[in-house]
Amino acid sequence: MLPDLSPHLHTKECNMLIEFLQRCHSEKPIGKMIGKCSYWDEAVWQCTKKERIWRRDNNPAYKRRIVELRSLPEKYWTPALHKLKEDGVLIGGADQSQGCKI
C-alpha cells in the first residue's frame, strides 16, 4: 500500500513518478488491474521509501529542523529516476519551487 500521494508531501522527483502512475491508471483502467502499471507503482513505492529514509537520516533529534525537503539528493534516487534523467525527462537540481518544507 502506498502512502498519501498528495503533491505537497513529496519531492519533485517523486511527484513526477506519482504523476506517471496516475496517468497510467487513467489511460489503462483495466490494465492497472492486471499489472500494466506495476513499473510505475514500484517506482513510486521505492521513491517514497527513499524519501522517508532521507528524512530519517537528516532529522536532528534535539535541534530545530533546518533542512528543507524539496529535492531528493541523487544518492537517494531510485533506478527509475536515474533512467528518467538519462532520457532527459527529469532535470535534477534546477527547480526548487516544489516539494514540502519539513
Curated annotation (Swiss-Prot):
Q: Which compartments does it reside in?
A: Mitochondrion
Please tell me which stretches of this chain the record labels as motif Cx9C motif 2: 37-47
Cysteine disulfide partners in this protein: C14-C47, C24-C37
The organism's superkingdom is given as Eukaryota
Q: Would you name any one GO CC term?
A: mitochondrion
Q: Which residues form a coiled coil?
A: none
Indicate which residues form the motif Cx9C motif 1.
14-24
Q: What UniProt keywords apply to this chain's record, in alphabetical order?
A: Disulfide bond, Mitochondrion
Instruction: Using the record's annotation, list all stretches that form the CHCH domain.
Output: 11-55
Membership in a protein family = Belongs to the CMC family.
Known role: May be involved in cytochrome c oxidase biogenesis.
Stated name of the protein: COX assembly mitochondrial protein 2 homolog
Q: Which organism is it from?
A: Caenorhabditis elegans
